[in-house]
Amino acid sequence: MTTLSSINLSIPPHLLPSTTNTCSSSSATSCSPPRSSSFVLHSPLSFGHRRLPISKKSKLRFCGVITKEAVSGSNDMTITQVREDDESEIDAPLLDPESLSKPRRIALFVEPSPFAYVSGYKNRFQNFIRYLREMGDEVIVVTTHEGVPEEFYGARVIGSRSFPCPYYQKVPLSLALSPRIISEIARFKPDIIHASSPGVMVFGALAIAKMLSVPIVMSYHTHVPVYIPRYTFSWLVKPMWSIIRFLHRAADLTLVPSAAIGKDLIAAGATAANQLRLWNKGVDSESFNPRFRSQEMRIRLSNGEPEKPLVIHVGRIGVEKSLELLKSVMDKLPEARIAFIGDGPYKEDLEKLFTGMPAVFTGTLQGDELSQAYASGDVFVMPSESETLGLVVLEAMSSGLPVVAARAGGIPDIIPEDQEGKTGFLFNPGDVEDCVTKLRTLLHDRETREIIGKAAREETEKYDWRAATTKIRNEQYSAAIWFWRKKKVHVLGPINWLIKRLFPVPEGNV
């Protein structure tokens, strides 16, 4: 009988999944996967020339797999259901320390540019590149061509000619499948390709990964099916989900910024639960810090009335952010002032909506100005229901601001139910009265505001970009490579079987 270990067309035997049953008959019950709590990878791998022992404590150390409970459970799924210390019965293949210490060659396809386009994932990718380079990895970045530097922390950056998104002109898109880019990536010889999704460039990244026979990881950052009804036609939602399913089923691993988004992808059939991982939160606690509080900035944000209660919103100003809700909220808080920091296609309309009201629109701020803007407010508000995580919420908390945000998308991953009222407040999406009640509590009670702001700051100090990057590099990329090798085995197995029968080896020559 042909075994996986007999396949030798292009994969060395020591890189194949072991077919040894690690469960004895007496322990079969304990080795069976619980019906409603876990997905099981049945075969550990041998890496190098020795088999790696896998202890129960290390079962999920490399990933944090989303369990079936995350799919079939209630809508109150939280980050705790995607955690490192999950006790599900999973054999996690781990690379040995020697393999992990070797530099990797990583090709990143990011659309739009994390260098020129202001968005929530800009800091995520910039810090990711920075810490990969600090770990000694070689990195090449393919992105849209506007404002692209030649290099970033030693990583080479390639700009691909882009075009504006038809329904969102400020978002540049690019297929990144020109002969020049294919040639550059082929010469680079990546160990793994990582592409942001959804978008147009991810198709180019997938094609190149297949051409070069390289594992591909896709990280999901923009919940486009939620945006579509606000920008185009609702009937396009189903075709969009079909595209997302096509892309992520072709990926070797999918990364998501929050458990809630992971749940949506699994429910839509876009990926298998055991091929989904969480990209851990991170925040630059030095750049976003209460020490940046500035009276001068507060005067600017309050339009010359720094003694008035000041509400802050930071982020892209788009119709999908539900910012029109804040008009009704501020109508009920006439004593307060509000400042919008950011730019976007909805800015002009929002300014018209707030005509005659005590609202300031600063446009895009960066560097110390942005740090000062965060730290100089009293409360941060986030009405958006479409956030895959909400990095601006983390930045506000790191700046010592209490947050009032919609209980939607990835926000409950940042302020879980057991932390509501301690590190921030969540309100029911679209509920003006609920939002007003929680804002008023904070705006008029300085002591409560300071206690929650301090607790929020302490909470965000747990989140570190270096640790998040290390986890992806050492554990989640390793998982992607393992799934990719496993997929190749499944493809080559029937071919190997056919060759053995067409060209049998005489017994005397074995």
Swiss-Prot record:
It holds the Pfam family Glycos_transf_1. InterPro entries: Glyco_trans_1 (IPR001296), Glyco_trans_4-like_N (IPR028098), Glycosyltransferase_grp1 (IPR050194). GO terms for biological process: cellular response to phosphate starvation; glycolipid biosynthetic process; sulfolipid biosynthetic process. It catalyses: UDP-alpha-D-6-sulfoquinovose + a 1,2-diacyl-sn-glycerol = a 6-sulfo-alpha-D-quinovosyldiacylglycerol + UDP + H(+). The modification Phosphoserine is found at residue 88. Its EC number is 2.4.1.-. The keyword Chloroplast applies. It is found in: Plastid, Chloroplast membrane. Residues 1-83 form a transit peptide. GO terms for molecular function: UDP-glycosyltransferase activity; UDP-sulfoquinovose:DAG sulfoquinovosyltransferase activity. This is Sulfoquinovosyl transferase SQD2.
